[in-house]
Amino acid sequence: MTVLIHVLGSDIPHHNHTVLRFFNDTLAATSEHAREFMVAGEDNGFTESCPALSLRFYGSKKVLAQAVIAKAKANRRQRFFFHGQFNTSLWLALLSGGIKPAQFYWHIWGADLYEVSHGLKFRLFYPLRRIAQGRVGGVFATRGDLSYFARQHPGVRGELLYFPTRMDPSLNAMAKERQRAGKLTILVGNSGDRSNQHIAALRAVYQQFGDTVNVVVPMGYPANNQAYIDEVRQAGLALFSAENLQILSEKMEFDAYLALLRQCDLGYFIFARQQGIGTLCLLIQADIPCVLNRDNPFWQDMAEQHLPVLFTTDDLNEQVVREAQRQLASVDKSGITFFSPNYLQPWHNALRIAAGEAE
């Protein structure tokens, strides 16, 4: 039997760390198909912190792709599970036959599916990537992403799977300890990445609420982002008074981030694709409703779980927000499919499917 190999094909430290810790702590003990990893980037202590995993690190995306292709060609029974697929060379290998469809299983993360960049390089590559995506052996994704993908590639197998957000189920009832009243606090975006469209989001919040709310913008990740942070701060101060605007430019530890989220009354996410599920989960867990772009297909996942969804096109005010909070508080969080531990069983299924052990 050939053991499944997992591929983290791009150096995305935060997400890669989450995946590796999840596999080490939760999956590796029960499945031999959850232990082998090829990772783009430096070790950064992963080998030491994930002793249950066999990790190989590669200095660049290109070097990793060459190693994957070599393994694929050497043994056509070898299967790979790609966690997010932002590696151009691997898509091209799937197109050229270097990697066969039956060897290629892909967990969609979001930006690896949607065609939102306007750069010339991306616009030229997207059509090729789209063809390659239709050749994968199978995809794993959120309900909304599966729906989006199936419209383009109806013949490719798709299975429901959620990114393993770090969650403590014991916190599901914690939100009820806080009485919500007074000035609203609104979280804008889930990180400092430009895909959050912070400036457009700040303008949208201002248009809805004026300078009557506290606005919190977490921008501590990614690193080396000061110029963009300054740009967002300048735009924010043109709309909101200094006491109502909080731009967080330092990276936060998880517990501090959790505490920050629980001080908020509303999350505001303007991006037109699925991203930031981790932050959405933590907000929902705390009975904090989220405003989504109607083009973000994750609203389908939320509606399927009978969660209230607010849209950027809705007329929003404090009364609407408080009602959404009330509705969220009435939901039994233990039954939400994309919460821990409910997302675990689909991961076990995904491993068997990708390894060729399940129909």
UniProtKB/Swiss-Prot annotation:
Role played? Catalyzes the synthesis of Und-PP-GlcNAc-ManNAcA-Fuc4NAc (Lipid III), the third lipid-linked intermediate involved in ECA synthesis.
Q: In which pathway does it act?
A: Bacterial outer membrane biogenesis; enterobacterial common antigen biosynthesis
**UniProt cross-references to InterPro entries, sorted A to Z:** WecF
The GO terms describing molecular function are: 4-acetamido-4,6-dideoxy-D-galactose transferase activity; fucosyltransferase activity
Entry superkingdom: Bacteria
Tell me what reaction this enzyme catalyses.
beta-D-ManNAcA-(1->4)-alpha-D-GlcNAc-di-trans,octa-cis-undecaprenyl diphosphate + dTDP-4-acetamido-4,6-dideoxy-alpha-D-galactose = alpha-D-FucNAc4-(1->4)-beta-D-ManNAcA-(1->4)-D-GlcNAc-undecaprenyl diphosphate + dTDP + H(+)
Q: What is its main location?
A: membrane
Give the record's family classification: Belongs to the glycosyltransferase 56 family.
Looking at its record, which EC class is this enzyme?
transferase
Going by the UniProt record, its keywords in alphabetical order are:
Cell inner membrane, Cell membrane, Glycosyltransferase, Membrane, Transferase
Membrane topology note: Peripheral membrane protein
Quick check: keyword Signal in the entry?
A: no
What organism is recorded for this protein?
A: Salmonella choleraesuis (strain SC-B67)
Q: What is its EC number?
A: 2.4.1.325
* GO CC terms, sorted: plasma membrane
Q: Where is the protein found, in the record's own terms?
A: Cell inner membrane
What is this protein's name? Answer: TDP-N-acetylfucosamine:lipid II N-acetylfucosaminyltransferase
Entry keyword Glycosyltransferase = yes
One GO biological process term: enterobacterial common antigen biosynthetic process
Q: Which HAMAP family match?
A: WecF_RffT (MF_01002)
